[in-house]
């Protein structure tokens, strides 16, 4: 399986293959998950002091905080996958 990388803001790169979920940080269960990840040393803060807009959960149980909207991250994820599919079909990745 090829490794796909996704930009989650400020030049921070995450392996797209390892992402399980991209969720909003607003709900209490997610906030609790962030706190628990911090306690376990599994929290990666990639917000650069900005407001957390997306919480990315990986298959290794890491919790990544991003200042990018969940939809934006998801869109990048989807367009990366589409680029992989259309790689040899003359599609230049434009919407």
From Swiss-Prot:
What is the annotated signal peptide range for this record? none
What Pfam families does the database record attribute to this sequence? RemA-like
User: Do you know which InterPro entries this protein is assigned to?
Assistant: RemA-like
Query: Which family does the similarity line name?
Result: Belongs to the RemA family.
NCBIfam families noted in UniProt: MtxBflmRegRemA, PRK04323.1
Identification of the protein by name: Putative regulatory protein Daud_1598
| Species | Desulforudis audaxviator (strain MP104C)
